[in-house]
């Protein structure tokens, strides 16, 4: 009886040892050895371990699994293209735009400085000067090459033509007023004296017969006034003015501006335009100063539409992007390049308790098998 119990215990211990060691060795052989072991040209069986040996296949299968079951287009759609995500993105963008642009005290010049355009006011003024100079040169060229008739519209020409009789009437009225004035009388007297003195002895003889020139002033004055009041005078002057005006309209406008100094005019014009623009002052204001309703417009119109279109476009391109990313190959490369030592450490660290239980289970099963074998041997 004692021999039976000793034999039974001995076989149970041997079975437990074999079962435990076998399971422990099997677990180790999942990862070890990391490389194949050779004796001369003969490779030792079961080297390298299962996972190192099948790492390429494992990498390919993991890549396929990830692409076909884990990171599928539908997974991305559910995760990143849901209505909730879109609303969160929209809210985030609205907040950032409001904080960064519309409620920020930064001026337009500050934004230009950030973008690297710190000399923008001077650059704009130079551009303005160049534009004004170009337009000024264009105007001068137009005045030099085109006639007044071409430059003036038909309506303006008709208006100016109609002003000629009015101008003639005004000139005659002013001439009449002048010759009836004391100053006009003095002018007439001086003209008569100059005329008589220019005729020499003949003039002196006339002066002797007529007496002093003062006696002629009244007569000449009346005749001049009659001449100015006569309808024929107005008609004659109107005709002369009209003829001369028609001749002038066929000449370039620049013919009448030959003596004008254009450089000072250009400089003053450029200065005036720059003063009116006040570029530096205008750029020294925040965006909200010129666009107070911009925040609400961006929030209610631009951002929602932009986000919606961006999500629709991104969802349309999702499958194409995933194909271009080639996630299967990425996973395969990463798994294939991942050190086996790190993988072993990771798996054992996570499943250490389970592996111990497997080892214990092997020992228990080995012990039970040893007991059964002991019983069989005893009965035989």
Curated annotation (Swiss-Prot):
An annotated GO cellular component: plasma membrane
Any Pfam family the entry gives: DUF445
Bilayer topology term: Multi-pass membrane protein
Subcellular location: Cell membrane
Keywords, in A-Z order: Cell membrane, Membrane, Transmembrane, Transmembrane helix
Major localisation: membrane
Entry annotated with the keyword Membrane: yes
Parts forming coiled coils: none
Segments passing through the bilayer: 1-21, 357-377
Domain of life, per lineage: Bacteria
Annotated family: Belongs to the UPF0754 family.
PANTHER family: UPF0754 MEMBRANE PROTEIN YHEB
Name of the protein in question: UPF0754 membrane protein Bsph_0374
Annotated organism of origin: Lysinibacillus sphaericus (strain C3-41)
